[in-house]
Amino acid sequence: MAYIISGIQQAGVGVENVEAAFKWYNEHLGMDIPVFDEAAEAALMLPYTGGKPQSRRAILAITTKGGGGFEIWQYTSRTPVKPTFKAEAGDLGIFIVKVKTDNVQATFDYLKSKQVKLLTNVSTAPSGKKHFYLEDPYGNIFEIVEFDDFFSTGRAQGGVAGAVVGVTNMDRAIAFYQQILGFDKVVFRTNEMQSDMHGVPGANHALERVLLTHSKKRVGPFSELLGRGEIELIAVRDRSPRKIYEGRFWGDPGFIHLCFDIRNMAALKTACEAAGHPFTVDGGAGFEMGEAAGHFTYIEDPDGTLIEFVETKKVPLLKKLGWYLDLRKRPAEKPLPKWMLRTMGLNRKKV
């Protein structure tokens, strides 16, 4: 059986204070359901943590509106190292995380009322979608993007819809994201200066922007919840890009990875090796993370940006009753019933 990508499960966000960050993302971006909250040792990420295990605390926060969540991650065995420079468009790594909304103006007005740092006004992207950019209190940039596929109603903003990634060789990067991750449709490709990014660091440089999405609807257990996704690639042409994580560890402040929910890790491993991007980390099939369990792996894109894959085995639906779902007993392509996923909303945490 071929591997299945159900969607973008989460974006990893390294922070200095996990509790404060969870509270901010809960209040401002609606990430109010903690799937797990765990303090443990990150013993398997040695290529990216200085060659030795590091202690950490992580909270996976999601919203039942639809879209991926945030894995909010803090070192506890060392002082998190902040970047020494302000990343700009085209720098290598995850520069921006995309968050979906069904009402761009309402989300803009809400965040403005909460005195969030808004980098742009609402404008139209080259894709034709309405969007705007903001910066959180920790220096991370988010793009709020208009989408029409949502799992439930309620507040306008949903979850993670994708990322903006800096690359050096556009054609090589496109091939990677198309071949392995299934983002086979080019929505736009432009070298022209775009006013929609005016206000975003580095937007005044000569940039090539490419937006990719997937032509086929995602399938799998969480596909209805995660919905459609997109990847925007940016290459800067009039300066030398820097690595956003140069001189720092994975888990230090910033966007540390983009994670995809998948089925059939063995088939994915074969495909990644054939494409020249073998797993750099393999957590094994019996890994547990708090109240969730699964198999996680990592690969690098052509410029070293970390992509995580998680094949979920067990997930808490209703913690108070000890109700957990074992996904190993379900067909790989079949979406979970909506009523079942909605029970996760009963784990909502007010701040």
Question: Residue locations for each model-derived region?
Answer:
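Short, structured interface segments
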Residues: 71-75, 127-153
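Core segments of cupin and vicinal oxygen chelate
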Residues: 13-67, 113, 123-125, 166-228, ...
